[in-house]
Amino acid sequence: MQKTTTLFFSFSFIFILLSACTFSRIGLHMMPAVSDYKLFPKDTIFAAASPSASFVEAQNPNILPPLAHWLPKDYRKGEENWAQFMKKSHSTAFLVLRNDSLLFEDYANGHEKYEPQVVFSISKAITALLVGIAIGEGKISAEQPVSDFIPEFSDPERRGIKIFHLLNMVSGIDFKDERDFGKLSVLYYNNDQDKYIRNFDAVEHRPGTHFAYKSLATQILSSCLETATGQSVGDYLSDKLWQPMGMECPALLTVDSREAGNQRAFGGFALCSRDLLRLGQLLLHKGNWQGQQLVPKDFIEQIINRQEDGRAYWGYRNCFWRNGDLEKGIFQDRDFFASGYLGQFIYVNPDRNLVVIRQGKKENFLWRYVFNRLARSLDGESTDLNDHCQNFSAQFEGIYAAEDGEEIQLIEQKDKKGNSFWIWKGPKEKKQKLKQFDGLCIGKRSLKTKKRLIFNKLGNNIQGFHLDNQDQVDLKYYQKKSSISLKGRKALMAEF
């Protein structure tokens, strides 16, 4: 009842804030879809006048390791073949580039090879690459304040926000995608986004101190980019990447309205799969395309390398996600990816010379872990995370505290077969059982939700964990406070 009441008042408040046009858009379209480019006004970035040659075909194309070798058991439904897997996973495209050869390409669920599809937050990564190019050209600096480009940001609350903060989601602006559904809806369906971002002056944290994934940050970033370059995001993309790379398909970029003409740089690009693969290949070669350095090499290396300066979230840099398994001491690959709503992915593994593209109409499991398994399987290596987690589970036990002071207790138990499971107890929660997930995370299924505890490991010691209950990487962090005493352990067990 409490949740229903909260949602009612939240939506009521949203409706009061929205203009009639924005309200009607939300009412008409509701949740975003991969075909949204058909619904909204859009600008076209034309295909290259001279498209680059098709990818080199691998010697044994369209052959991947059996699903059982790299797809976790939780994700498999019996002995599925590939066609069944594509259908059940709601995938529309799956492409694998290895050693610069097209190893695998498949389309499903009504999607055609050259058909565009909205890539949502991969748009953020594309926008960031353009900012990297502008930095290399001296048109903008990562250390430059946003107020140099948007005068409204000169107010006391926002004047400390810099380009770097927007690139790395540490701006401190009071906007968080998974928390503020109302604000995100207003941003997505607003008919004048430039006006919206200029007037959005709520700040909750000092810039550079807190990571929070927010689409608003990239839209602000795109406004700065356009002022710095004197071009729209779409025109700059055409000049700097689309034409030089010989892209096969037009790129589409939705705009808020024909009157305002603001391009949705945070999530409005619609691209064909093969051009996504070319972007992945560009990233694989650190911004170099057939001998021409299109994106500064150091901008890409900032994503790949784990050289932190204390300001960026460990799993996110320059609008790309980093696998994070390296930080947890599990795998040593320096892989990274761009991702978008409904499971759009550009996955890049420089150590294995691999790019994977996945597009779909639904994200029903954690692809970011699947891609690394596929990469290892292609190289004939074990994909069982338990092989890389020796003596890992015993360190889970302890008392953990979040930044807001909330504490939880976690203890390990064994079932009759000797398999580990854990007992979780929070301040407002009944004691719950959690089962291990692939040796890396533990979680519990409750109806259609799953809590995931993704551990942060330094050397042989557990430092804490991130709590993720939405299958996305925006996580509440709990730091290990102390071990659990024998007395505390008995008290917790007595609640059973």
Question: Which residues does each PLM region occupy?
Answer:
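Active-site SXXK
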Residues: 100, 117-142, 166, 221-225, ...
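Active-site Gly/Thr loop motif
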Residues: 248-254, 304-355, 432, 437
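Short active-site loop at a secondary-structure junction
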Residues: 85-95, 106-139, 143-152, 157-159, ...
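Active-site helix/loop module of the DD-peptidase/beta-lactamase fold
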Residues: 118, 136-174, 202, 227-266, ...
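N-terminal leader/targeting segments and the immediately adjacent pre-domain N-terminus
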Residues: 3-7, 16-111, 137-139, 382-384, ...
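Structured C-terminal helix/loop/strand segments within mature extracytoplasmic catalytic/sensor domains
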Residues: 22-28, 338-390
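Peripheral terminal and inter-domain segments
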Residues: 20-25, 383-496
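Active-site-proximal alpha-helical segments within enzyme catalytic domains
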Residues: 217-224, 265-289, 344-361
